[in-house]
């Protein structure tokens, strides 16, 4: 089943509400999320009324720690969902992990979050170990048209589109509150309103949308490869991260990250940091623990 919305976050919200409506997710059910996830994602779960918990990442894959994940699933029968984020657009194959999850509990709903990966319109979800895969062409994604998200859902599940009002001022206020929580290391208190959605509508037809993205994809890929080749040649190999993490942006790891970013900005150039460990933001009781998510954030810079 093809899912197509104004934002990938709307796809996620709609599937969560559908899982609740059709009894796959119950009152005590829990989804597991990685600690280095985009901070707006847990807010989608709060809006949908679905409980969640965080798991630290692996420094090897920069994705959710598989050993800890499986241990937690074995111990807690209320875990009924896993959101596996392909951090930095990595092509890491998590199929074996998904198989192990299904061995423990075949009813656990697995989402393959590929929003930072190259959009794939030919993905065969019925041959996948995941139940849903999501891609995005929104702001700062692999292909950025500032709009649109799509996914593929196994036909054994139902998907209902929710009628939602959208207020840009609500979204701006939510973003402001989140940024403040991240900056000051304080808890984020969620207040539900009309922040989810978009007041822009570029395509009604998924076919036309897919045609446009497919058409510009080779140019985007070629440009990224050109930039990455320059970085590979010019930068010290010791700061370069593995090539598998440079599909979306070119990643480096440095000890003086903040100083480096200031120098880049001062030169009129642009780079970015990535998502922090958001455990403290959402009230996790291990907020003072030096997690792998905190460590990776302390040194990783995304080069454009």
Model-assigned labels for residue ranges:
Residues 257-300:
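Conserved PLP cofactor-binding pocket of PLP-dependent enzymes
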Residues 16-74:
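Conserved PLP-anchoring active-site segment centered on the Schiff-base-forming lysine
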Residues 1-24, 36, 220-228:
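Conserved N-terminal alpha-helix of the aminotransferase class I/II PLP-enzyme fold
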Residues 25, 158-159, 255-264:
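Short, conserved charged micro-motifs
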Residues 156-208:
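Active-site C-terminal subdomain of aminotransferase-like
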Residues 199-229, 238-253:
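Conserved glycine-rich beta-strand-loop-beta hairpin in the small C-terminal domain of fold type I
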């Amino acid at each position: 089943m093809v899912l197509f919305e104004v934002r990938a976050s709307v796809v996620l919200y709609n599937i969560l509400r559908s899982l609740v409506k059709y009894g796959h997710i119950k009152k005590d059910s829990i989804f597991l999320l990685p600690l280095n996830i985009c901070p707006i994602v847990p807010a989608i779960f709060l809006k949908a009324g679905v409980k969640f918990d965080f798991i630290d990442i692996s420094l090897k894959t920069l994705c959710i720690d598989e050993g800890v994940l499986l241990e937690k699933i074995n111990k807690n029968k209320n875990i009924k969902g896993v959101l596996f984020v392909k951090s930095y657009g990595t092509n890491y194959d998590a199929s074996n992990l998904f198989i192990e999850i299904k061995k423990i509990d075949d009813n656990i709903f697995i989402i393959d979050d590929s929003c930072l990966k190259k959009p794939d319109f030919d993905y065969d979800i019925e041959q996948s170990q995941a139940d849903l895969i999501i891609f995005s062409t929104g702001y700062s994604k692999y292909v950025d048209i500032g709009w649109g998200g799509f996914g593929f859902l196994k036909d054994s599940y139902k998907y209902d589109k929710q009628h939602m009002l959208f207020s840009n001022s609500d979204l701006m206020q939510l973003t402001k509150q989140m940024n403040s929580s991240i900056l000051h290391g304080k808890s984020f208190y969620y207040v539900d309103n009309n922040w989810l959605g978009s007041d822009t509508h570029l395509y009604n037809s998924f076919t036309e949308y897919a045609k446009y993205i497919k058409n510009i994809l080779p140019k985007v890929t070629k440009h990224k490869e050109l930039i990455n080749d320059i970085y590979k040649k010019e930068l010290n190999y010791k700061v370069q991260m593995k090539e598998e993490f440079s599909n979306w942006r070119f990643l480096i790891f440095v000890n003086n990250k903040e100083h480096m970013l200031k120098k880049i900005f001062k030169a009129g150039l642009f780079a970015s940091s990535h998502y922090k460990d958001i455990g403290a933001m959402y009230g996790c009781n291990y907020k003072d623990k030096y997690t792998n998510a905190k460590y990776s954030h302390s040194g990783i810079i995304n080069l454009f």
